[in-house]
């Protein structure tokens, strides 16, 4: 279970564009109190709750995509 953070890289992109490993699946998306019927064309929004099922190391790799993108630092 992961909450899509504002500024996350996945926001606005269709689920079908995610290059998830074959062992990882999005099984549900909640928007507010509503369970949404989703498809590959569905785009995630901030505060969506995404239920993912997969291997632990694959999930660990993908979780940062649902979190806020790190601000780039100037040198």
Predicted segment positions?
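Cytosolic Rossmann-like ligand/nucleotide-binding regulatory domains
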Residues: 1-68, 73-75
């Amino acid at each position: 279970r992961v909450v899509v953070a504002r500024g996350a890289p996945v926001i606005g992109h269709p689920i079908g564009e995610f290059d998830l490993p074959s062992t990882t699946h999005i099984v549900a998306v909640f928007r507010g109190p509503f369970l949404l019927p989703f498809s590959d064309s569905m785009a995630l929004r901030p505060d969506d709750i995404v239920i993912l099922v997969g291997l632990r190391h694959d999930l660990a790799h993908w979780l940062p995509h649902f979190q806020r993108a790190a601000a780039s630092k100037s040198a």
